[in-house]
């Protein structure tokens, strides 16, 4: 599986960037890689109306409506994003990160909503969403997140997302998401929480 953004979700990303310590890579380069992960994802999903930002740039989200992807398979976009990311990484970084990402595959899937939805069912999937740390507590996340939920409710659509921390699980729970499955593997001390919000 290609290097891809989902592997850099909170929790998973920490484990992967720790792996870069083996190469003596410092904080600045780790930050550069993390930004490249997000940028590569945005670059391939933006043509499908998946990238959104608040007018004041306090927050941004990568969210797709299944029907807007048309005939494109989500895994194709992941592969394309991974290819773009690989162009930024050195061979040594790929050698260190690649095996870890492969090993984490069972707890970093972004195609699980397709396993739960009917073949012709439209839905909203949150790939990533974040707020400028300096804007936390300002209501920026609610301003970013709520319009997607309102759209889903108006159109009778389920929303899907996954996260890796109890704090985020609780946050999304306040917006009506329920954890439907937890995934973990012995090799890494993290747990993926698969969450669904039904239309209201």
For each feature predicted by the language model, list its residue ranges:
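Conserved acetyl-CoA-binding loop-helix of GNAT-fold acetyltransferases
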Residues: 131, 137-150
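Helix-loop element at the rim of GNAT/NAT acetyltransferase active sites that forms part
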Residues: 2-29
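Short hydrophobic/aromatic beta-strand or adjacent loop that forms the aromatic wall/cage
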Residues: 58-59, 190-195
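Conserved beta-hairpin
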Residues: 43-65
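Conserved active-site alpha-helix within GNAT-family acetyltransferase domains
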Residues: 154-156, 165-182, 188
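Active-site rim helix/loop that mediates acceptor-substrate recognition in acyltransferases
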Residues: 23-50
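Conserved GNAT acetyl-CoA-binding A-motif
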Residues: 123-124, 151-164
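Conserved acyl-donor/pantetheine-binding loop and adjacent beta-alpha core of acyl/acetyltransferases
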Residues: 60-130, 136, 186
């Amino acid at each position: 599986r290609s290097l891809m953004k989902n592997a850099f979700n909170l929790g998973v990303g920490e484990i992967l960037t720790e792996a870069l310590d083996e190469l003596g890579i410092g904080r600045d380069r780790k930050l550069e890689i993390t930004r490249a992960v997000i940028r590569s994802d945005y670059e391939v999903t933006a043509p499908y109306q998946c990238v959104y930002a608040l007018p004041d740039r306090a927050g941004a989200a990568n969210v797709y409506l299944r029907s807007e992807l048309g005939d494109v398979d989500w895994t194709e976009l992941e592969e394309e994003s991974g290819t773009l990311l690989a162009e930024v990484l050195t061979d040594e970084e790929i050698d260190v990160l690649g095996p870890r990402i492969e090993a984490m595959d069972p707890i970093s899937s972004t195609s699980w909503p397709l396993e739960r939805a009917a073949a012709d069912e439209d839905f909203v999937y949150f790939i990533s969403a974040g707020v400028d740390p300096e804007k936390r507590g300002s209501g920026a996340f609610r301003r970013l997140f709520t319009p997607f939920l309102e759209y889903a409710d108006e159109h009778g659509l389920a929303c899907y997302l996954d996260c890796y921390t109890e704090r985020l699980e609780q946050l999304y729970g306040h917006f009506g998401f329920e954890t439907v499955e937890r995934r973990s593997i012995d090799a890494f001390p993290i747990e993926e929480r698969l969450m669904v919000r039904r239309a209201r």
